[in-house]
Structure formats: structure tokens, C-alpha cells
Amino acid sequence: MIESTLFPIVAKINEYLSNYILIFLLVGVGLWYSIRTRFVQVRCFGEGMRKFFGELNLRGGAQKSGMTSFQALATAIAAQVGTGNIVGASGAILTGGPGAIFWMWIIAFFGMATIYAEATLAQKTRIVEPDGNIKGGPVYYITTAFKGGFGKFLAGFFAVSIILALGFMGCMVQSNSIGSTMETAFGVPSWIMGIVLVVICAVIFLGGVQRLAAVTEKIVPIMAGIFLLGGLVILAARIQYVPATFGMIFRYAFQPQAIIGGGFGYALKTAISQGAKRGLFSNEAGMGSTPHAHAQANVAHAHDQGVVAMIGVFIDTFVVLTLNALVIICTLYTKDGPLAGGYTGDITATLGKTNLDQTAFGSVFGASLGAKFVAICLLFFAFSTILSWNLFGKINANYLFGRKNSKLCSVIYTIIALVFIFLGTVSGSDFVWELTDMFNNLIVLPNVIALFALTGMVIASLNEMQKDKLKV
């Protein structure tokens, strides 16, 4: 009764926040930092790539506290490259047409400047305690931006929202994806998958930051490699359609009415809004989630982690999400695909109830193998996201309850999180999904406000590090 009453209210709040307020805030902060840093995402992209590929030995050795820069990036990518990269691309294409992918690229480009600022601020405001424990994330730069009661209120609001959005309900959503896909593709009962998942997660969670970092730095390259290899096989098999696929992305970015119907104005608005929304919530730039990971990095200067953080957005959107989109478009929308020729009919009736990715990969691998491949990718993506989101939530729980209660808080938080993870594998609720989206939307507000307020700190850090090369 309560759920049925609240569901339409929460859905309406989400619609208003995501369609109006958040798009303008997140795009706005990306534009702002792009201009104020004179497009740091362009000028420092090469530097970020060199660091990513190990020129400065980012992997390092075992850490007594915190993470290496690579481990921090891997933990951030684990959060960014989740089920949203599969669902996000297909959802954007379904609603906004292939042209929505172009607008995803535009959003990600500006998002790279935003995440540079987030990572820089996370490094500048982090606290290293006497025992070596590192505390850092948006709550710390929010209270730096705003002193007194207002800052504490914004930080507390952010902390509660992210605990609910990512630490508890968000992990439940991810585990539901694991449970349902593994049962469908491999016949594994969801409750068995739930028990296995809880045991594995418990072992990792109880090992602290170092154990989680050791896992993410290994699992992220593996999961990305598997998905990229599968996607490249599809593109190789459909190589003759790849040029046309890129052509459709660019053409329908500005002429979307030809494929999604409606008037030009409505179709263009739909393509842009779908690309923007899906892109923003895929790479998480401006949401305040990944700064928790970047704060843990042991680097010489905050700028170093800022440029590395930009590579996370690049990998998430320009590599993984783009490859997924190319696979979908070149198998389903080109000449001999089921959605070719400006298709505007009932997609569910045409393809059945299977999702676009299963159909796309199944067109080359075969239906059974295609479904299994997508299921394995979802398993990796969702599992790695659970690990990162749990850490982000725990950091905020410890902030709320203080250092004296941190051990007890961590234990209680972990137990509750494991319960949500198990429940997610065996049950699903559209209302929980809506609540998760709502709290995801809400965490953006205090984070973006602080990002605007601390522009001077970001610019000073950039000038300090590169005063001879990038005087702003």
C-alpha cells in the first residue's frame, strides 16, 4: 500500500530532477571547469595516458595505507563501468536513436574536466590519520567550501544519500542484475548465487581498503578485456557496416526524427536528453562517487590524480560504452539488421523480450552463447561496482559516526550491506529502483555546489603543478 502510494511520487521527483535540474547542473559544471582550466582534458590528456600506462610506475608496491594511483583509478573505473554501460547504451539508443551516442561523447568530454576537479579536491582536502587511515571524499571538500552549520548540513545530506543510493540500495540493484542474468543464462538458482556473492563480498569487505584495491586492480583489466575482445569480434564480423554505423551516429545526432519519429524539435530534444542523461550517470562525473577512490591514492601532487581520473571517464564512455553502442548499431540497425531502414515500430515485439545486447552479440555468437557472454560481462561489471560502491558508502558512514566509533560502524554497515546484496539477488522491486535513482540524483546537488565554490582551489593546484606549461 505504502509502496504503491509513494512510487508515482518518487518517479515524478526523479523525472523532474533528471530531466531539468541535474542535466543543467552537470553540463554546466563541466563547461565551467573546461573554460576555467582552459580545457585541461585536452592539454593534459597525454599526461594522463602516460601515467595510466605506467610511465611513472603508478602500480607501485604494497601499500600500508591508501592505494596506489592505479588502484584508485581501477576502483573508480569499477564503479563507473557497471551495468549502466550495457543498459545505458541500449537504453539511449532505444529512446533517442543512434544519434544519442554522439551526445554521450559530448557530455563525457566536458565530464573529464569535472572529474579532474573532483579528484584534485579529494586529494587536497583528504585527512591522513596517525594510524595511516585516509579519509577523503566530497564530504571533506564540502565542509572546506562551507564552514559552520550549512557545510555540516550539506555534507551530512550527501553522506546519508550516498549510503542509501550506493552502499545499500545501489548494491541491491547490482546484485539483482547478477542473480537474474546468471539464472537465465546458466540456470543457477538466484538464492545460491546470492549466498556465493555474499561470502565473496564479505571476505573482501572485511579485508579493508588494501584488499579491495588488490581485487579491483586485477578484476578491472580482466573484465574490460573480455568485453572489448567480444565487442571487437562482433565488429570484425560486421566490418563492412562499421563506417555506416559511425555515419548513423553523426547523422541521427542532428536528424533524429528519421529514426525515432515525431517532429524535428521533439526528436532532437529526445536524442540530446537521452544521450546526456545516460552519459552523465554512466561515467559518474559530477556525482561525487569516484572522488572517494581518488582520495585514497598516494601521489606526489593532487594534479597527478586529477589527470589520471580523466582517463576513467575516457575508458568508461569513449571505450566501453562506445564499443557496446557500435555493436548494437552495426548488428541491429544496419542494412540486414532487424531495426534497419528507419525502424519506428514496437522493438519488443520485433526482438522479443531479450535485451538489445543479447540480440546483438547473439547475431554473431548465436543466441545461447550471446546470452551467456552478456551474462558473464554483467557479472563482472556488477560485482566490481558492488565492491567500489560499498567502499564509498562505508567512508561516509564513518564520517557520520566519527573516528571513535569507526570499527563498530564498519561492522554494522558491512552486515547491513551484505543483507541488501543477498536480498537483491532473490527479489526485485521497481520501487527500490526508483528510490535508488532518487538518492543518486540527490547526491549530485551538494557535490556540484561545492565544486563551483572551490574553483579557486582547483585552479591554484593546476597552476602550482604546471605553472611553466599551463598558466591559467
Task: Give a label for each model feature.
Residues 29-34, 107-132, 139, 143-176, ...:
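Helix-loop-helix module between adjacent transmembrane segments
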Residues 110-118, 195-209, 220-240, 273, ...:
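Selective recognition of specific alpha-helical transmembrane segments in multi-pass small-molecule
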Residues 25-29, 36-49, 158, 175-182, ...:
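Membrane-interface loop-to-helix entry segments
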Residues 1-83, 93-100, 111, 422, ...:
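N-terminal alpha-helical transmembrane segments of multi-pass membrane transport
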Residues 5-6, 36-41, 84-89, 167-179, ...:
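Transmembrane helix-loop junctions in multi-pass membrane proteins
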Residues 39-67, 91, 97-100, 113-149, ...:
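Flexible loop linkers connecting adjacent transmembrane helices
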Residues 60-94, 121-124, 130-139, 143-145, ...:
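Alpha-helical membrane segments and immediately flanking helix-loop junctions
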Residues 116-126, 130, 232-248, 256-263, ...:
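Extracellular/periplasmic helix-exit of transmembrane alpha-helices
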